Amino acid sequence: MGNRIPDEIVDQVQKSADIVEVIGDYVQLKKQGRNYFGLCPFHGESTPSFSVSPDKQIFHCFGCGAGGNVFSFLRQMEGYSFAESVSHLADKYQIDFPDDITVHSGARPESSGEQKMAEAHELLKKFYHHLLINTKEGQEALDYLLSRGFTKELINEFQIGYALDSWDFITKFLVKRGFSEAQMEKAGLLIRREDGSGYFDRFRNRVMFPIHDHHGAVVAFSGRALGSQQPKYMNSPETPLFHKSKLLYNFYKARLHIRKQERAVLFEGFADVISAVSSDVKESIATMGTSLTDDHVKILRRNVEEIILCYDSDKAGYEATLKASELLQKKGCKVRVAMIPDGLDPDDYIKKFGGEKFKNDIIDASVTVMAFKMQYFRKGKNLSDEGDRLAYIKDVLKEISTLSGSLEQEVYVKQLASEFSLSQESLTEQLSVFSKQNKPADNSGETKTRRAHLTTKARQKRLRPAYENAERLLLAHMLRDRSVIKKVIDRVGFQFNIDEHRALAAYLYAFYEEGAELTPQHLMARVTDDHISQLLSDILMLQVNQELSEAELSDYVKKVLNQRNWSMIKEKEAERAEAERQKDFLRAASLAQEIVTLNRSLK
């Protein structure tokens, strides 16, 4: 069992770690007054309700209630243990961390196996790269890359490598270094023979592209065949390390550029990303052989608002663009589309016309989703033909009718009227027909029920019982004034009605008894339970008077203690009813007297 992290190390790490900087690696934050706000990473939202306080060094979401300090943020975001979060930040801020502390959480028994998988991937990334750059076996692969426009600088930047044309070289290479074959199969690096006689290498005679997770660790590979081998591209399978529906290629490198440019450029494949980065579009990322998912969108939305889609110009690429734009817009993203000329993908375009033209004429000249759709609707239609022209105009009007802004609708109606020499009035009239068709039937009863439900839900969230509010206010004053802690110890002790309140009070009592300095930062560092940490951030956000008057204190204490008596009265009344049912009138009379006594204590 590892030793406990010394308090002075925890304090040093917390003082050095800037919570705005740490959370800013995950969430796009904007300063509003003294605090910073962004979209909560713990629940879906389109309006920022996630607050970070640099003064108090805490975060709090007014939407879902998540909250805590820099350590609890990493615990909730990454699944770290407390020790892991302290160790991670100590490393980030170059603070010496004791060697005798066990960092990995016992709650993750698979972590040692995953660690071996990660080590194998990192080792192979370096080995594959060495084979490509420094050996005669890798010369053909290197020549291929150079002929395709890859520079040696780009090859080094993305650590591109080469897998030998061998069935068992990597198998022997890994076994010799102490890796289990079964574990490496689970990591996606080896394949078990059908007859069960052993294992063979998954990647053979391929140019190897390492795939990193969002923190920069290698978790998978994609191999491009050099000869006639099929498939042309082979990706690692899903593994405990690699989940393609949750990973965006190059995101760990692109994140800072995305923040700086305030946009992300999304491609369909990693080859497009590498070419785009060489063209100085460094905010480039890609999905890994899968359609855009909700998880991808959540990652993007936490970091940026504007997404430029740059997919292939074939039919499949157009349809993927439509699907991705719809998903992104539903989550509150501003979407634009980079239009590639027909028959080309982004990589082809860059090789044909150059990186500067790609950046200026394609990426920086991206269009709105509506403009892209208007171009898409033209495909396969002869606009000189009246039938095709009418079909096109109807398609465009239907799409315009789905736009939420009347100003935006007017812009495209004017554009349509000008292009086809039609009156704007007739188009607007037809537009109103489509707009009415878009509106769902209003079931007033159902609507009222839904509104009532939402109102009730909001009221439940906003209104708390009097005793609960009293406990929260007592805790808030205790956090601001040491003298209040002593008064609450004497009058309430541990008689808080809510378990989390009782636990937080225990922390405050301990600080008081130790004579320790009581600050939000010190208390947050001591609290390792996420529920208590969340409660603490919530309480710290409460607005209370600078001083607690004796009348207010007495009122809060009375509400807290009376609640326990109310609970006891209910229990006694239930016992009395049962005694009367059993015809035990002597016990019923005794219980009635106890109830009278309890009722008197409420006054």
From Swiss-Prot:
Entries under SUPFAM superfamilies matching the protein: DNA primase core, N-terminal domain of DnaB helicase, Zinc beta-ribbon
Keywords: DNA replication, DNA-binding, DNA-directed RNA polymerase, Magnesium, Metal-binding, Nucleotidyltransferase, Primosome, Transcription, Transferase, Zinc, Zinc-finger
InterPro entries noted in UniProt: DNA_heli_DnaB-like_N_sf, DNA_helicase_N/primase_C, DNA_primase_core_N_sf, DNA_primase_DnaB-bd, DNA_primase_DnaG, DNA_primase_Znf_CHC2, DnaG_bac, DNAG_N
This enzyme's EC code(s): 2.7.7.101
Record field: catalytic activity: ssDNA + n NTP = ssDNA/pppN(pN)n-1 hybrid + (n-1) diphosphate
A GO term from the CC aspect: primosome complex
Domain Toprim: 262-343
One Pfam family of this chain: Zn_ribbon_DnaG
Zinc finger feature spans (CHC2-type): 40-64
Subunit structure: Monomer. Interacts with DnaB.
Protein name listed in UniProt: DNA primase
Organism of origin: Bacillus subtilis (strain 168)
Gene coding for it: dnaG
